[in-house]
């Protein structure tokens, strides 16, 4: 099973991916945690480009979309190969490119070989709350920009059947909702939920 956490910066993706992976391990599952960009050479190049001053220009966004698609192929062989019988929990997946690098049709085409998650959990949060969590220091943490990203995430969630979780609450409440979503997929009874 491939589980992906999506959401704007500051929504808690990294925290909840780690907590979910830990919970699944406690319930006897072999779990692999991944993130996008990955730790591959391509992922390192992506992180470098994301921190450049021109990261939001159209040409750099197109380059990033192509690099992200290539980076996802480094995951595909693991997810569909060695890890096929295990659980993969990811902090982002190809849906991030749809909201950050769009337009949607082009991003779908270049990601046609990217692994598709079985479950996507969108951690939805108000832009101002997310910016407070992040400290508002990142180039991508501009309120108008993030509001557009959030809106695109909500549209994708509606169109693609993501589970949407209110991420403005405390960690335990958010994690409880995530576990309630995932428990039926794993045959975990309610006693295994916070």
From Swiss-Prot:
Q: Record keywords: Ligase included? A: no
Query: Would you say which domain of life the source belongs to?
Result: Archaea
For this UniProt entry, which segments traverse the membrane? none
Coiled coil stretches, renumbered: none
Keyword annotations of the record: ATP-binding, Kinase, Nucleotide biosynthesis, Nucleotide-binding, Transferase
Q: Which reaction does it catalyse?
A: dTMP + ATP = dTDP + ADP
- Could you confirm whether the keyword Kinase appears in this record? yes
- What does the entry list under GO cellular component? cytoplasm
The EC designation for this entry is 2.7.4.9
- Give any GO molecular function from the UniProt entry: ATP binding
Which GO terms fall under biological process for this protein? dTDP biosynthetic process; dTTP biosynthetic process; dUDP biosynthetic process
For the ligand (ATP), the binding residues are: 7-14
Which family is annotated? Belongs to the thymidylate kinase family.
The family database entries (HAMAP family) matched by this protein are listed as: Thymidylate_kinase
Q: What is this protein called?
A: Probable thymidylate kinase
